[in-house]
């Protein structure tokens, strides 16, 4: 009988952990590129603003050379994540991850340590 009780206890633990993992996974929804696309401005603290659209095809347009000065690499694409946006170079390597602060606003650090803010302007 003690083995059966132990088995039942283990089964309950597995069920609770599985249910918790499912609930947690469903709370981290990755926004679609269509939801995040639009006119954006990126600013490095005290260095001005670079503007350009983030297109639905995950491409960046506009003055990316301006942002390249701060990021140390030319951002050509972006990818949404559950908690923000990755800016990536031509090889698809992540340059920096920007964390979502509120609707339409993301902050992060450049590889050199400068603070950057990305904001929706439309």
From Swiss-Prot:
Subcellular location per UniProt equals: Periplasm
Q: Which SUPFAM superfamilies match?
A: beta-Barrel protease inhibitors (SSF50882)
Name the UniProt key words of this record, in alphabetical order.
Metalloenzyme inhibitor, Metalloprotease inhibitor, Periplasm, Protease inhibitor, Signal
Q: Where is this region: Disordered?
A: 101-122
Q: Which is an annotated GO molecular function term of this record?
A: metalloendopeptidase inhibitor activity
Q: Where is the signal peptide?
A: 1-25
Gene3D superfamilies documented for this protein: 2.40.128.10
Keyword Lyase attributed = no
Q: Name one GO cellular component term.
A: periplasmic space
Q: What is its main location?
A: periplasm
A Pfam family the protein falls into: Inh
* InterPro entries linked: Inh (IPR022815), Inh/Omp19 (IPR021140), Protease_inh_b-brl_dom (IPR016085)
Q: State the family named in the UniProt similarity comment for this chain.
A: Belongs to the protease inhibitor I38 family.
| Protein's UniProt name | Alkaline proteinase inhibitor
């Amino acid at each position: 009988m003690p083995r059966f009780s132990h088995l039942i206890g283990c089964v309950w633990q597995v069920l609770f952990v599985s249910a918790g993992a499912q609930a947690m996974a469903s709370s981290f929804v990755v926004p679609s590129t269509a939801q995040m696309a639009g006119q954006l401005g990126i600013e490095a603290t005290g260095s001005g603003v670079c503007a350009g659209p983030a297109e639905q095809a995950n491409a960046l347009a506009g003055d990316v050379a301006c942002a390249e000065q701060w990021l140390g690499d030319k951002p050509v694409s972006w990818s949404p994540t559950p908690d923000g946006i990755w800016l990536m170079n031509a090889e698809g390597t992540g340059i920096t991850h920007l964390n979502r602060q509120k609707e339409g606003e993301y902050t992060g650090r450049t590889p050199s340590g400068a603070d950057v803010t990305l904001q929706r302007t439309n």
